[in-house]
Amino acid sequence: MKRYIHFKEIDSTNTYLKNHHTSYGDLTFISASYQTLGHGRFNRNWESNENENIMFSILIKNKFLLEKYSSISLLMSTCVYKLLVALKIKDLSIKWPNDVYVNGKKICAILLEGIPQEWLVIGIGLNVNQIIFKDSRAISIRNITNKKYNLSILKRKLYRVIINELKLLKKNKSNYLEIVRNNNYLENKIVNVEINNQQKKVKVLKINDDNSLKVLVNDEEKNIISGEITFHS
């Protein structure tokens, strides 16, 4: 069965794979030139002009990888990080658990959805050629380099990086956690968050070995897993 499928237009690559996961095998790659209902975590809108950015989703069904669910989001962030390093992009950082930043502005968002014990859909949105954004906190590769990129070539490069990193994860040889820790966007920052429906200010301390985030809340250390916390600007 074909692993790489591209749509000119779709509501959302993640939604498509979620609705059709039984029809496709492990590591199926679905991309689109334009998403009419692209979204990030907590259904936040993901702004992307047609044919200017990379938007794709990958289906995971491998049992070992599903057991590594807590590692996947950070691993995907490091895949994007490695691609950007290869493009000589500097001032990179990774915001736990799923965003990549350049000089404090978001260049990539990652979304995980599914039933972790059965299947997982990983959605990646990477700003490439778009120049103007409604959100001043967004940035693209072209904004940084002043170069226009072939999206098909860049997508396939990123796909190869992802496949290679997943193989390393299976062998317990991935260095994703080291990369995330060395480029931790949140480390030592005071941030506004929502925990258990309560607004709080916390200090981010570090990323733990189990991929959880250690924060200081009212002088008390607390470990947070992805999904338990929402960051606010």
Question: Which role fits each region the language model picked out?
Answer:
Residues M1-L87:
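N-terminal lobe of the biotin/lipoate ligase/transferase fold
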Residues D99:
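Conserved active-site carboxylates
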Residues T28, K90-W96:
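A short coil-to-beta-strand element that immediately follows conserved catalytic motifs
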Residues R3, L65-L92, V102-S233:
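Long, positively charged amphipathic alpha-helical accessory segments at protein N-termini or as interdomain linkers
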